[in-house]
Amino acid sequence: MSFNHQEIEKKWQGYWEENKTFRTPDETEKPKFYALDMFPYPSGAGLHVGHPEGYTATDILSRMKRMQGYNVLHPMGWDAFGLPAEQYALDTGNSPAEFTEHNINTFRNQIKSLGFSYDWDREVNTTDPNYYKWTQWIFLKLFEKGLAYVDEVPVNWCPALGTVLANEEIIDGKSERGGHPVERRPMRQWMLKITAYGDRLLEDLDELDWPESLKDMQRNWIGRSEGAEVHFNIDGTDEKFTVFTTRPDTLFGATYCVLAPEHALVAEITTAEQKEAVEAYINAVKMKSDLERTELAKEKTGVFTGAYAVNPVNGEKLPIWIADYVLATYGTGAVMAVPAHDERDYEFASVFNLPMKEVVKGGDITKEVYTGDGAHVNSAFLDGLNKEEAIAKMIEWLEATSAGNQKVTYRLRDWLFSRQRYWGEPIPVIHWEDGTMTAVKEEELPLVLPKTENIRPSGTGESPLANIDEWVNVVDPETGKKGRRETNTMPQWAGSCWYYLRYIDPNNSEALVDPEKVKQWLPVDIYIGGAEHAVLHLLYARFWHKVLYDIGVVPTKEPFQQLFNQGMILGENNEKMSKSKGNVVNPDDIVASHGADTLRLYEMFMGPLDASIAWSENGLDGARRFLDRVWRLFVQDNGELSEKITDAPNKELEKAYHQTVKKVTEDYAELRFNTAISQMMVFINDAYKAETLPREYVEGFVKMIAPVAPHIGEELWSKLGYNETITYASWPTFDESKLVEDEVEIVVQVMGKVRAKLTMSKDASKEEMEQLALEAIQDQIEGKTVRKVIVVPGKLVNVVAN
């Protein structure tokens, strides 16, 4: 007989809710464990089978840790601001708040149906004014510290969506949502100075237990590079520009310079003959995103300005070009080109037939670029030096002649923090008619997002908030001065930067988080989520955390001690699940047909947690069959406990049981859930063959399966006679001595050749080993004299006979 999953799951979910089984107390003597999931964006589509994979992993850990005596913080909430809700509201005329609330209710019900052990009293929602009051408070702190500032920035403007998009929201020059054209235009934007934390964000990665590949992605994004700035005068004018280079040693090999099309000097230095071509090129570039412009594989394009720069080291005149691969926002917006020794410069020079000059020996620049090390040539005072020596000497020369200086730069840009949308946190700043700007006072927070029917983009580049006169226009009660509220809103990243702190103290109206509580719970012990957030979310959260550390709000330098990215669950055809392909699997259907325990077990058994694996109905059926076998082993058809279960010990299962406890305990802790489940399957096979099942082993097994399949775990626990939940029962332990084999295989050799293999007690004495060995090879030594017997206890017996 199989178990009735619908009945059992409903029963235990009701029990947990009624008894607040997973409520986390703050005051406790127990050690702490904080298991965090990346909270979901509550989309209209609801939960998909990819969500529960990470959630089940943290849930298994949380449930095991509770049984091991830890006080576990395992919360859930909603990252609910953002573009999709606003887009839905624009398309349907409904309010984004209603849409979001409806979706959250759907998500919450779906998540509860999967039996996760969340403390729902700590639920947070980034769109709740009691929550975003503190998001705004953090913004005020950034503003006070000079880390939030306004700047004119060329942005990706999408006229159809009426908003600015981040580089990540653009694919092939079109918006990711809706595929609308995107163009570049300068706009007043709020920026956060994440670059001020570049070194700390880089150095502190070393202390974290994160996958190395993920740390490397962050290192590359921060992109620290050491080199020099070099100043170039523009021939025939008083103007000059500066370039940054990691290879100042190749300055003698520079044959031209390139400015970004947006560089401030371009209009000024372009000659009359080149004006038309330069302007046409600049207009064409406006349509491209930074990512497209810097694509390595793309065809090089550019235009000569007609102007020349003077190389400070030898007085040579170098033609100045503009090209889209140089970005105004990166470095200085200008580069010196050394085509003989730089790949990109070489390609550009080849396309436009520009000269090349060898200054480092080792290659043949008539055939290809040479980027390796070697002795310098054609370089006056650098001749004969290698790369490191030449860099040091050139920097010395640049500084002595005031032609340049040593410099460290970052690929990391400051964080563009404003969005021209309605559905986000209002930025608590007022712009006054006299040109000054002040922050809203702390006691006036939260600055609540006003309700409005009209959330169409203003079309001017401002957010829809600009349309709400009674909200936007303010008067200073003391001076009578008129002002306008900031109409930009914060990006979706803002609320997700600090939510892990609010779970610690979700109802505090006086402070972001109580200092004692935050000391108790930080850092997060394990954070599990998708790899798509590897760079931005984690970098932004680490940045905010460091700012909060600097102002004494948090006691740790880093928020997340251990981080793990789960893999992706693909469709049965190995393609990404998507509505358009029609291969999305809805967890509600699986919960109805197979049960939540089966879904949880299957997703953990599919393969390693970080692998991307195709969904399989057969695999799902197999997971259900295993749970049915477990049920049938312990429960009779009449619903009573199996008569095989007894209080007497059973030697034949002893080793298998202790092995299982050891492997499952270690594998759960290391997130190797698939191999832990395999081991439990092996144990169940052995248990079916056994005549009797010691009660201790049955209880231990039920405790081990419960974190993966909690409903069946609770039901079996109650059948074993317990009235309390299994949640806080103590985790089974294993005895190392029971894992050791009682018997060993002994090799018997005659004159060094193997003649027999014997099984005997591992404690057999030398005399016993010798006696048994001689009996076993009697026929081999007949008629010979035994000269010597060498015995290695527990291993072998070698007989010397002739």
Swiss-Prot record:
Disulfide pattern: none
Catalytic activity, as annotated: tRNA(Leu) + L-leucine + ATP = L-leucyl-tRNA(Leu) + AMP + diphosphate
PROSITE patterns cross-referenced by the UniProt entry: AA_TRNA_LIGASE_I
Gene Ontology molecular-function annotations: aminoacyl-tRNA deacylase activity; ATP binding; leucine-tRNA ligase activity
BP-aspect Gene Ontology terms: leucyl-tRNA aminoacylation
Cellular component per GO, a single term: cytosol
Chain segments annotated as transmembrane: none
Coiled-coil residue windows: none
EC number: 6.1.1.4
Enzyme class: ligase
Record keywords, A-Z: Aminoacyl-tRNA synthetase, ATP-binding, Cytoplasm, Ligase, Nucleotide-binding, Protein biosynthesis
Subcellular localization: Cytoplasm
Superkingdom of the organism of origin: Bacteria
Motif 'HIGH' region, residue numbers: 40-51
CDD domains named among the record's database cross-references: Anticodon_Ia_Leu_BEm, LeuRS_core
NCBIfam families in alphabetical order: leuS_bact (TIGR00396)
HAMAP family the UniProt entry points to: Leu_tRNA_synth_B
Family from the record: Belongs to the class-I aminoacyl-tRNA synthetase family.
Protein name listed in UniProt: Leucine--tRNA ligase
Organism: Bacillus cereus (strain ATCC 14579 / DSM 31 / CCUG 7414 / JCM 2152 / NBRC 15305 / NCIMB 9373 / NCTC 2599 / NRRL B-3711)
Name of encoding gene: leuS
